[in-house]
UniProtKB/Swiss-Prot annotation:
The gene is Tpsb2. Its EC number is 3.4.21.59. This is Tryptase beta-2. During embryogenesis, detected primarily in skin. The lineage of its organism: Eukaryota, Metazoa, Chordata, Craniata, Vertebrata. Residues 1-21 form the signal peptide. Glycans are attached at residue 133. The keyword Disulfide bond applies. It comes from Mus musculus.
Amino acid sequence: MLKRRLLLLWALSLLASLVYSAPRPANQRVGIVGGHEASESKWPWQVSLRFKLNYWIHFCGGSLIHPQWVLTAAHCVGPHIKSPQLFRVQLREQYLYYGDQLLSLNRIVVHPHYYTAEGGADVALLELEVPVNVSTHIHPISLPPASETFPPGTSCWVTGWGDIDNDEPLPPPYPLKQVKVPIVENSLCDRKYHTGLYTGDDFPIVHDGMLCAGNTRRDSCQGDSGGPLVCKVKGTWLQAGVVSWGEGCAQPNKPGIYTRVTYYLDWIHRYVPEHS
């Protein structure tokens, strides 16, 4: 009975978010602001996560990092509700709901230190029931080496099907959007988030396991949560971050905050083979 009640409460809260309730001071991310439609040949690792309401509705993004594993944000699937039967995965799709071929999950692994997105460890792994066939249209994104820092000013890309502005949902036919964003140094990002707060500068908001990117014209937003932030390094696309949280979307002095992939590589590789 308790489990059923928790599931009902979780589903109702998810439904409320899908009809765009008023934003909180810090929002888990849902869309692309200041971007444009992606071409069909780009971002072959992009994933749409689905939850069953009247139909399998998109609620978060993700990335294929191995033929049988998807990387996403913990707040999309946890911390309490982890039954894989509740979710489906749609691999690279130009327009949401057009030609769906939904895939079932075998298990969901949420980082054990996750409690809220703002608290960090906002990362989860989804194991597909069956490995996908890798092709030019669908293939994994490479994870970075632990030594990769993605220095401030690096131009990266974030993709998703979320809001295109604060409280402005992506309109039909729901195209995959992309936006180019600059990496923002963590200490600068932390200072920006302390502006107007009374927590004191010695209370960290942006932790080591986080990465900041974006500006007042370009950012991820609500619906993009769990999706990839990718950067091209020496000719190879690497996933630098996972869309996590932020204050509003493309707000002045409030970059988007991402889970820093390199910080969690050891945990990821406990489950995901390093070479597919």
